[in-house]
């Protein structure tokens, strides 16, 4: 019996979990490592675009992901200055391009949990919590991963290592890979509330609010109880401390700026975080690969980061499968050529433009950006082209052209 190719995956966020599950389903031996003792359930990404739903279907999680989330056919742009809707975009225009012409709003910790549960069905797959990577070495024959578990260090040997261990990636740092880009001077405040913005103000499940004073994002998620809750994202002022931004008066002022009916008693979570636009100088060093946030970070406007990470995972597993079948080692570089190039052309470019569109302060430029959105909505051909990019379906198509 042929020896199983062993893949170690560092990081049990959704990208690492999808990578591990896809590896197991392709007949690899898999060890999934997570430094923490549990899955992180803090409010993070929740938007799963049509292109990513196709990949989620491939690993057998589409029904559960959809059942645990909210289906969002539309997304809207609003003008905070005039309190009016600017444009609405309809994913149903993609019905001839994908089996999933909609977005599913399912929190990322749910995807990680269901993926780990399914991973347990495969006898050659193992999940290890409280397992932190502390050293990596490699040669032509494999990679050695030193892992700290319960105060002791153990060494795992494998054929390949996937670093999906987040923006502060230990794997990336151990490889000495530069993380090129910048950090925004403002932080983002995320407020989760039970207030029903759809009932009160007519917002749909995904909303982008442009404002000359301050922009906002507003979207609905199901919650673990499936009762529904809303997340509102705001920029902080550069002079504002974390404590000031999360204080009751600031929280209430931000929420009532969207809907005067909001109250503090409906707020169930508040958080603040730094925001980056960064990309790793390399996605591959020998037998070690980076995927997800370990290889790229972007602002969350548009919900593209997690989606791009899942695309990384699926592209990488396909690359490893080709190597197992006899493709030359040089073909492994195709992963970097595809994923790094597409991250720059689709993720970095779109998220930077998304932020500029919402925060524009110059009256003439601001009007031009809003008018462009109106024109896109009015033209089905242009709207579909816009949706092909925002859903990353165009990215998936373009990947196949990069040899």
Regions found by a protein language model. Name each.
Residues 11-21, 115, 163, 267, ...:
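Conserved mid-domain beta->alpha element of the FAD-binding
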Residues 1-7, 22-26:
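Extreme N-terminal leader/targeting segments of oxidoreductases
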Residues 44, 49-118, 347:
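Active-site-adjacent segment of FAD-dependent monooxygenases/related oxidoreductases
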Residues 117, 160, 164-275:
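Conserved FAD-binding catalytic core of PHBH/FMO-like flavoproteins
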Residues 318-403:
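C-terminal helical "tail/cap" subdomain of flavin- and related membrane-associated enzymes
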Residues 3, 151-160:
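Core beta-strand elements of the Rossmann-like FAD/NAD(P) dinucleotide-binding domain
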Residues 24-44:
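Glycine-rich FAD pyrophosphate-binding loop
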Residues 129-143:
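A conserved short coil-to-beta-strand element within the FAD-binding core of flavoproteins
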């Amino acid at each position: 019996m042929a020896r199983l190719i062993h893949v170690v995956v560092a990081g049990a966020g959704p990208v690492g979990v999808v990578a591990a599950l896809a590896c197991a389903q392709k007949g690899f031996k898999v060890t999934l490592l997570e430094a923490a003792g549990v899955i992180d359930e803090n409010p993070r990404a929740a938007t799963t675009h049509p292109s990513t739903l196709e990949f989620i279907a491939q690993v057998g999680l589409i029904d559960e992901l959809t059942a645990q989330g909210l289906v969002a056919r539309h997304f809207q742009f609003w003008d905070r200055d005039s309190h009016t809707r600017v444009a609405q975009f309809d994913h149903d225009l993609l019905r001839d391009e994908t089996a999933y012409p909609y977005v599913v709003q399912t929190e990322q910790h749910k995807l990680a949990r269901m993926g780990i549960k399914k991973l347990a069905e495969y006898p050659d797959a193992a999940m290890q919590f409280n397992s932190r990577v502390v050293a990596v070495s490699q040669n032509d024959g494999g990679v050695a991963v030193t892992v700290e578990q319960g105060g002791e260090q153990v060494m795992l040997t494998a054929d390949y290592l996937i670093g999906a261990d987040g923006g502060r990636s230990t794997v990336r740092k151990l490889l000495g890979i530069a993380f090129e880009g910048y950090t925004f001077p403002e932080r983002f405040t995320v407020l989760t509330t039970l207030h029903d913005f759809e009932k009160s103000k007519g917002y749909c499940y995904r909303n982008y609010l442009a404002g000359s004073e301050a922009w906002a994002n507003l979207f609905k998620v199901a919650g673990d109880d499936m009762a529904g809750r809303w997340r509102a994202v705001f920029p902080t002022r550069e002079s504002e401390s974390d404590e000031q931004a999360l204080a009751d008066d600031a929280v209430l002022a931000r929420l009532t700026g969207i809907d005067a009916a909001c109250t503090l008693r409906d707020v169930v979570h508040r958080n603040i975080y730094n925001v980056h636009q960064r990309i790793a100088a390399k996605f591959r060093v020998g037998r070690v690969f980076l995927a997800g946030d370990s290889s790229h970070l972007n602002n969350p406007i548009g919900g593209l980061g997690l989606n791009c990470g899942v695309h990384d995972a699926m592209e990488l597993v396909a690359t490893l499968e080709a190597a197992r079948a006899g493709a030359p080692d040089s073909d492994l570089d195709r992963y970097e050529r595809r994923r790094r190039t597409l991250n720059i052309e689709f993720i970095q470019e779109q998220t930077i433009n998304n932020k500029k569109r919402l925060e524009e302060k110059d009256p003439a430029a601001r009007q031009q950006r809003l008018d462009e959105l109106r024109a896109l909505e009015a033209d089905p051909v242009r709207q579909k082209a816009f949706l092909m990019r925002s859903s990353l379906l165009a990215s998936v198509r373009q990947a196949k052209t990069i040899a």
